Amino acid sequence: HLILQGKGGVGKSMIAALIAQYQLTKGKRPLCLDTDPVNASFQAYKGLPVTRLNILQDEEIDPRSFDQLVELISHAKGDVVIDNGASSFVPLSAYLITNQVSAVLQDMGHQIMVHTVITGGQAQSDTLHGFTQLVKQFPSDVSFVVWLNPYWGPIERDGKPFEQMKAYTVHKDRISAMIRLPDLKKETFGRDLSDM
């Protein structure tokens, strides 16, 4: 479970935490990795067994450090949940695509599932563009889980929901699941979620 989106602050770490928590409730012990070199948000969730993977070398992202990531995945017996920060989005995506990591991992018995976020509000265009670019760049055997996060506003354009937007209609065959995060009242549960 690879959480990828080039836009920061859209809920990637929260989604990684939700996936990890779900796995734990099913009695599984996922390998949880935080590759964000700036904010270790996933690792900050207490109670989750998250390991932070240092991908910086002399304050620059070292693409070769992703070899260690693939090595960890290759030895994993169960699910792997990887939170990737906006600052390392481009280098990690380039590494995965250039080195055909999905094919390598599939040969080892693993399946890559890319989770991405579409958000409402000001970042909506950026997240839609990010999703479209991911789908175009990753091989066709990689499927996507799209998380719709209304925290910053409704996910609609010109009165149309995501399912009627071009980003969805053109690429719907690559989407294996769509998860709608609830639009919680800001005064109650929304505040709790935001504090997390």
Identify the meaning behind each predicted range.
Residues Q5, A17, Q106-G109:
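Amphipathic, alpha-helical segments enriched in basic
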Residues G8-G9:
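Walker A (P-loop) phosphate-binding loop of P-loop NTPases
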Residues L2-L4, V81, V114-I118:
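Short glycine-rich or small-residue beta-strand-to-loop segments that form or flank ligand, phosphate
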Residues K12:
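Conserved lysine of the Walker
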Residues L2, A16, T25-F89, Y95:
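Nucleotide-state-sensitive switch-loop elements of NTP-binding domains
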Residues S88-D183, E187-R191:
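Conserved catalytic-core segment of NTP-binding enzymes
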Residues M196:
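C-terminal boundary of histidine-terminating zinc-finger modules
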